[in-house]
């Protein structure tokens, strides 16, 4: 027994085949095996055995992967009245005609059928079920494998099978039903069987309990110690033998055996059809028990056995047509299918014009107008209100008459203040057409340095061409900030557009989030901001080419010791000049 157990454990797992047996009552002894017959319409590969008598409850059994190479047979010899699943088959029939010997088959053997008196034939199932004679109405249905088999069948069927003993290790299935023969060629042919089990005279059986476990002893203990408590031993009650109906479904390559086909219900009993779940070899026993208690299985729904095909098709079409189909967002086609579920509220399309090109239909729909100052206006215009009030600067009444012009007084005051300061540099004229940002490159104060970097990042993201003036690199820029801000304390960063102050880092961030900064700086957008200056590397300052940054003049007095050296007049106090390309 130990040798057989070790041989079975070395086998590869047998996946893809399991069998369902539905029996309302306990069956008695069944005859020796014969060649298999099946109909080509089954769908699931599981095996169920009904343990109790006079009950329609089925016991599910899921063959585990450790059951590879086991010899499967239903029933027992005529002497006993069991309904268990054994791994060996005793061919010693209790008949006075001819005594038979006990054999243990090393291949997978499935016997389904009623008891029919006949001779025992040792043969191999045919590779393709080509020829088969007409069988009786109660011809047995058997699945056998290559090797030595014991077939108890009609003489015509036994004569058609080839009597060879080669081990090809593949399952051959023959379909035979009342003289009509069908061949299942391609779907079921890949079950590998063991070939190293020797024949022994010792009778060893594995009794399968209702939880799906099999045990090498008669106590029905799977090793957990709970099988005897949860599952009592089955009652042995002999019943009349019925020839079951075997169905083979090619779609999922599974086998289903239905014994209720020939069962005749009594007039007092009403049949209650319960959908059966077909389990695979990897299902757990707990899952099988839970699914068997349910009144409806998933396989029956997916297979369409409960609903007509036309009704299922109408339901699927209705579900697809029920949801609205979103194909565009803001007039633009969706790049991905999931883009229809996102809603973006960022003002990304307000400035759709790309570097002066206004050919886009979306840009034309926005009705942007060029902010050109009116010819009747003389003086300085506030840069923060010029873009908003260029098209709607006039004040109109309800009847449409013009009652005035917006911000005319404000612009007049700005012009008056500029004319009253002749001694102060006119930065509006100096910085006309420019965006100037005063920053610092000194990183000692982290907060100030981070704010400067953030403002520069915002301007570069908007592709704005601006002039950066580093007050840490030049004393001249520090003096400009004091004059512009009219304060001795210098606070950076500060943004100026057309010579007018826009604000510090907080104001720039707020304008950027509201979208006003994009509209304000739209005339200064340039693709040249994506490129770095090759001369200065983006620093906008270069060492003086005259003194090479040493501040010593080339015109030195080498004859007297009164004047040691003259300072260079071409650069600033640190020996730097502005980049000519920037």
Curated annotation (Swiss-Prot):
Ranges of compositional bias, category Low complexity: 291-300
Entry similarity comment: Belongs to the GRXCR1 family.
Domain of life according to the entry: Eukaryota
Region spans: Disordered: 217-244, 260-300
GO BP annotation list: sensory perception of sound
Name of the protein described by the UniProt record: Glutaredoxin domain-containing cysteine-rich protein CG12206
Species per Swiss-Prot/TrEMBL record: Drosophila melanogaster (Fruit fly)
Stretches with biased composition (Polar residues): 217-227
Xref: InterPro entries: Glutaredoxin (IPR002109), GRXCR1 (IPR042797), Thioredoxin-like_sf (IPR036249)
